[in-house]
């Protein structure tokens, strides 16, 4: 799992 990509997706959804 690419955590950097996952975190980026979560941040995009959160914003």
Swiss-Prot record:
Keyword presence, Secreted: yes
What is the recorded post-translational modification?
A: The C-terminal amidation is required for full activity.
The Gene Ontology CC terms held by the record are: extracellular region
Q: Where in the cell is it found?
A: Secreted
Free-text tissue specificity from the UniProt record = Expressed by the venom gland.
UniProt keyword annotations, A-Z: Amidation, Antibiotic, Antimicrobial, DNA-binding, Secreted
Per its UniProt entry, which superkingdom is the organism in?
A: Eukaryota
Entry-annotated residues carrying Lysine amide: 15
MF (Gene Ontology): DNA binding
What family is this?
Belongs to the lasioglossin-like family.
The entry's protein name is: Lasioglossin-1
Give the species this sequence originates from. Answer: Lasioglossum laticeps
């Amino acid at each position: 799992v690419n955590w950097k990509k996952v975190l980026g997706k979560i941040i995009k959804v959160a914003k």
